[in-house]
Curated annotation (Swiss-Prot):
The keyword Cell division does not apply. It comes from Arabidopsis thaliana. This is F-box/FBD/LRR-repeat protein At1g13780. InterPro entries: F-box-like_dom_sf, F-box_AtFBL13-like, F-box_dom, FBD, FBL13/AtMIF1-like, LRR_dom_sf, LRR_FXL15/At3g58940/PEG3-like. CDD domains: F-box_AtFBL13-like.
């Protein structure tokens, strides 16, 4: 029997106001304000929402007059001023707003759980006509907020409060924050005051010589890709992480001249896109002994990892390093996803030799932009004999000699291989699937039960 809905029947309005407020909390404040026109009951419901999510571009600024925005925030904070707030999110990447940090401080004092502030504002110097960031330092009560669970700051200033204690903070995302000029406030001091911190995403400030993270609670750490690189770095920068509970780490691009890892004994997964040198298109000098020692110590420090994702940049760096140093064994590693440049396929056996217990391999090949030199895959890594069960070769464009050579290398040498997957970016132009199957089935498979799968 089909159910019918009475015309004009509003199920949402029948919900309790407390539940409606929680629903509106997940919308931008601009959207929740619009609900005030629905009916008399909805007129002030948005003021009961336990949080703000504002973009200052939604307010009409005239002659740098920020009064409308400030009045809006003040009205919201004063309404039910004894109730707790759950979230305060604001993007004021437009003009500097006088005493805006006071409003942030008011929100913090209301027991917020989520603080998300982006303050990417600039001023133009009249003398040199260069744009400089306007730094809005966070209020001091931020550093002792007992309710804060998630903190995200972009282009904000952090000064030394003397003491940091954020007992509930689990998630922290800092994007190019500015530390005060005293030199006593830094990432290490901030993290040390977060006893239950689990996730840290950090895009650094170019002015710090050493950036250090020490945490026993930290489980996930990421340095994301940075779209704008500084062309005028004044100092050589070192990054150091000491986190015995860390399970996941992602390093996406070379923001630091030197990386030091310590006590990463719980590391499960790592995602690497680094070359161990700062500079677009640069590669490190294999004759640089301190750099070789740094790479050796880094690889040894992450060698307990179980799952690795590795970019073509890092593969190139490892190939360079392998000519002058020994890549350590990753005895716990069972899964690897590697983007492999076609020009470095000769390095593939030595690369896989470092993973003696590898079970799953996803190999993304890159189409050669020029005629490749002949290469031979001769040496058989240890994992081929006893552990390698699943191989996927991705990024295939057409079926050629190089692709056949890679596929036959795995089929003819892997003793326990269960599945070989060939993933094409489209349909091969010059071969049908049946042609490829026929060619591969002529090979002598070392593992007779290996299944070949073609994906187009």
């Amino acid at each position: 029997m089909e159910s019918t809905v009475m015309p004009g029947f509003d199920r949402i309005s029948e919900l309790p106001e407390s539940l409606i407020s929680q629903i509106l909390l997940h919308l931008p404040t601009k959207a929740s304000v619009k609900t005030s026109v629905l009916s008399t009951r909805w007129k002030n419901l948005w003021l009961n929402v336990p949080g703000l999510d504002l973009n200052c571009r939604d307010f009409p600024f005239q002659n740098n007059n920020e009064k409308l925005l400030i009045d809006f925030i003040d009205r919201f904070l004063q309404f039910n001023n004894e109730s707790r707030l759950q979230k305060f999110k604001v993007d004021y990447s437009r003009d500097k707003i006088i005493k805006f940090s006071d409003r942030i401080g008011d929100a913090i004092s209301r027991g917020i759980r989520v603080l998300d502030v982006e303050s990417n504002t600039y001023y133009r110097d009249a003398d040199d006509c260069i744009d400089y960031p306007c730094i809005e330092f966070m209020p001091l009560n931020l550093y002792s907020c007992k309710t804060l669970v998630s903190l995200k700051l972009s282009y904000s200033g952090l000064e030394d409060p003397g003491f940091v204690y954020l007992p509930c903070l689990k998630f922290m995302h800092l994007r190019e924050v500015r530390w005060d000029s005293s030199g006593t406030m830094n990432l290490e001091k901030l993290v040390s005051g977060c006893p239950v911190l689990e996730e840290l995403i950090y895009l650094h400030d170019d002015k710090l010589v050493v950036t250090r993270v020490r945490s026993r609670s930290l489980k996930r750490f990421s340095i994301p890709f940075r779209h704008k690189l500084s062309l005028f770095r004044r100092v050589t920068q070192t990054f150091e992480i000491d986190a015995p509970g860390l399970e996941y780490m992602s390093l996406k691009a070379d923001h630091f001249d030197r990386i030091v890892v310590k006590n990463l004994t719980s590391l499960f997964m790592i995602d690497l896109d680094i070359k161990f040198i700062v500079g677009f298109g640069w590669m490190f000098d294999p004759e640089d002994l301190p750099k070789r020692n740094e790479i050796r110590d880094f690889l040894t420090g992450i060698s307990s990892v179980r799952h690795m994702v590795i970019s073509h940049n890092t593969v190139k760096a490892l190939d360079l390093y392998s000519k002058v140093g020994l890549i350590p064994k990753f005895n716990n590693l069972s899964r690897v996803e590697a983007a492999f440049p076609s020009s470095l396929l000769q390095f593939l056996p030595a690369f896989l030799e470092s993973f003696p217990n590898l079970k799953h391999l996803i190999l993304e090949t890159e189409c050669p932009v020029e005629v490749m030199e002949k290469f031979e895959l001769v040496n058989v890594p240890r994992c081929f004999v006893s552990t390698l069960e699943h191989v996927e070769i991705k990024g295939l464009f057409d079926w050629g000699e190089q692709d056949m050579k890679i596929a036959s290398y795995f089929l003819e040498n892997s003793a326990v291989l269960k599945k070989l997957i060939l993933s094409f970016m489209g349909c091969p132009q010059h071969y049908s699937e049946s042609d490829i199957y026929e060619e591969l089935n002529k090979l002598t498979k070392r593992s007779p039960r290996c299944q070949i799968i073609i994906r187009c």
